Amino acid sequence: EEVCLALGIYARRVRFLPYSPFDFDCHVVTEIYDRSQEKWYMLDPTTNGYLVDEQGTILSLLEARERMADTRFVTYCKATSREKNLQKLYRKNISRTAYYAKNLFRIQVDAVSQFGESGNWLNFPPEHFSIREWSVASAEYRLEMVPAYAKGYADFDEAVQLPRMREAVE
């Protein structure tokens, strides 16, 4: 995102998260805005790829989520791939496409596109989804799992973190 902004390209940092409050996974990508097309395009710098429809048109995350929800064609493409047959690409990249599908339940966009993170996100959950209920369920699960969770982190101070986590649930 920051490289694009430095080059004068409208860009935003986008996180996408799964439905389950027990799945702590999320993925962060960059979307760039094409002024001539008046459209956002998702680029994944982590995997060096993007998502396309059956015509090979690069999609935004919102477009990909909508298409996946309607069981329409979406596939992951590696930027270095020379394969033109999208059905072959789909079969080859099914696990990566499935990973995106799993995490495309909830989308968060930086409230302000800037250098560094502002910490403020705009949420784009599906209709009728309660972020508060999800957050409470996730916090309760983490509280339950704290002993196992904390073992992997030397800087995790239970005396400090547990009260904060309990407060978030209340």
Residue ranges and their predicted role:
Residues 1-15, 30:
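Cysteine-centered nucleophilic/redox motifs
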Residues 23-27:
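Short, solvent-exposed loop/turn segments at the edges of secondary structure
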